Amino acid sequence: MLFLARDVTHSTHLNTRSYAKHVALNEFYDGIIDLADKFAEAYQGKYGLIGPISLMSAKKTGNVVEFLEDQVEELMEMRYKVVEKECTPLQNIIDEIFGLYYSTLYKLKFLA
């Protein structure tokens, strides 16, 4: 899911004519990979190896804000299914991921 977000935002970043949008999306796709890696390593340290990761494909949408908002909803639904609430180190990384999404959404909605 996070790799898909990186691909969609990078593609949009390359095709936008808005400098503010270009910069916001650049920050997102650079940051999301670092956070995905950080989460995967910590998760595997606690639970063991994840195994093969299947790559998702994006639903057709021309609106990157809607795409990111949909991903936030999906992440909210999954967070306690993937990691128990009491595992605060991993939940903190998930919170960092949400922080990146929300910061990017702010920049796209109000600054771009």
Task: Give the label of every model feature segment.
Residues 3-4, 96:
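Aromatic- and histidine-enriched alpha-helix N-cap/loop-to-helix transition segments
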Residues 4-27, 82, 86-87:
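Helix-loop segments that flank and shape redox-cofactor active sites
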Residues 22-51:
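Conserved alpha-helical segments that form or flank metal/cofactor-binding pockets of metalloenzymes
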Residues 38-43, 103-112:
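Amphipathic alpha-helical coiled-coil segments
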